[in-house]
Amino acid sequence: GWTLNSAGYLLGPHAVDNHRSFNDKHGFT
């Protein structure tokens, strides 16, 4: 499963920001 940690670690800060935006759109915040 993908997490903010794994996304940030594997892809970089831009991936973390993108993931946050994704979560926000789905109301997972």
UniProtKB/Swiss-Prot annotation:
InterPro entries, per database record: Galanin, Galanin_pre
Name of this chain's protein: Galanin
UniProt GO MF annotations: hormone activity
GO cellular component, one term: extracellular region
Species annotation: Gallus gallus
Pfam families: Galanin
Positions where Threonine amide occurs in the chain: 29
GO BP annotations, alphabetical order: neuropeptide signaling pathway
Secreted listed as a keyword: yes
Subcellular location: Secreted
Function: Contracts smooth muscle of the gastrointestinal and genitourinary tract, regulates growth hormone release, modulates insulin release, and may be involved in the control of adrenal secretion.
Keywords: Amidation, Hormone, Neuropeptide, Secreted
Family from the record: Belongs to the galanin family.
Gene that this polypeptide is encoded by: GAL
